[in-house]
């Protein structure tokens, strides 16, 4: 059996990161986390301990600070793989503050790759996004679909990161999985962890549930003239626990099968769901949610 060493998770207290930690621990991986809680809460790590029975070692630091980052690798020289989630991710904010997004998302990646080279880490899973496909001319997309012009600086940071990783693998002994996933949804069945961003949520499900719980007065549906069955925007949603398990599978692929270089994997359900269908789904109903149709001035993730 391959000794898989220790896995570093960046953004371990975040939505997808926390669910991935659960899945990795269930599959006998040892993990440590880096998260400065810029868009998450320490309580997520406390709940992970309740859920798994294991205390999560976390380092509260900024990944753009290379000297502080290197201290983690010096202390944990048995790190054998990295899953990189940590990034600024709000599309609309990235349009308003592009330099903030380019500086943070790219410099954090550069520093991690510097550490990969210095500390001989050869397995890297990157949290990419279906946003790299832009406004694709042909649907559904697959891993060979050409990348179109990015629709936001956030999406462009994902495109740039993929290119950097592809170039990096050409001259270094490293294996990379690029996971392009669609829209994560849901929460762990325990209810202890889920999507809990700071500030006003920009993903559709927290806005819907927040409206149901009375945290928001109304749920605004942006756009009602799309070429869809009910005129509202359609997205491919995938349960966050499935995405989390995909990262475990990607790591196993790197350790056991993959050769040096990049492998690209899309992660989605393959089925589109409109905003109105999502409102009507399961416990939600149009009778219990006050919603308003509006213009396409904003898009939920």
Please identify what each model-predicted range represents:
Residues 61, 65, 197-201, 271:
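Residue-level signature of the cytosolic catalytic core of signaling kinases
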Residues 64, 89, 101, 200, ...:
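Glycosyltransferase donor-binding loop in the core domain
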Residues 102, 151-159, 194-202, 206, ...:
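Short-chain dehydrogenase/reductase
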């Amino acid at each position: 059996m391959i000794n898989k060493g220790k896995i570093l998770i960046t953004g371990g207290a975040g939505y997808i990161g926390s669910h991935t930690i659960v899945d990795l621990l269930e599959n006998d991986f040892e993990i440590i986390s880096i998260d400065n809680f810029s868009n998450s809460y320490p309580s997520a790590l406390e709940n992970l301990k309740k859920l798994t029975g294991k205390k999560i070692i976390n380092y509260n630091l900024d990944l753009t600070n290379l000297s502080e980052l290197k201290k983690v690798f010096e202390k944990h020289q048995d790190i054998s793989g990295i899953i990189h989630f940590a990034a600024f991710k709000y599309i609309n904010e990235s349009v308003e503050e592009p330099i903030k997004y380019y500086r943070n998302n790219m410099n954090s990646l550069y520093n991690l790759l510097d550490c990969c080279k210095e500390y001989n880490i050869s397995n890297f899973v990157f949290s990419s996004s279906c946003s790299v496909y832009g406004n694709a001319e042909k649907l559904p997309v697959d891993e060979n679909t050409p990348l179109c012009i990015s629709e936001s600086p956030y999406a462009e940071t994902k495109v740039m990161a993929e290119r950097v990783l592809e170039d990096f693998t050409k001259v270094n002994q490293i294996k990379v999985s690029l996971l392009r996933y669609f829209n994560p949804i849901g929460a762990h069945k325990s209810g202890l962890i889920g999507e809990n961003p700071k500030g006003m949520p920009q993903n559709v499900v927290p806005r819907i549930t927040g409206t149901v719980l009375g945290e928001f007065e109304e749920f605004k549906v942006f756009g009602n003239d799309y070429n869809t069955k009910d005129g509202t925007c359609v997205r491919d949603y995938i349960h966050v626990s499935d995405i989390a398990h995909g990262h475990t599978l990607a790591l196993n692929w790197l350790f056991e099968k993959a050769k040096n270089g990049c492998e690209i994997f899309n992660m989605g359900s393959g089925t589109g769901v409109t905003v109105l269908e999502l409102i009507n789904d399961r416990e939600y109903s149009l009778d219990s949610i006050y919603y308003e149709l509006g213009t396409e001035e904003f898009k939920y993730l």
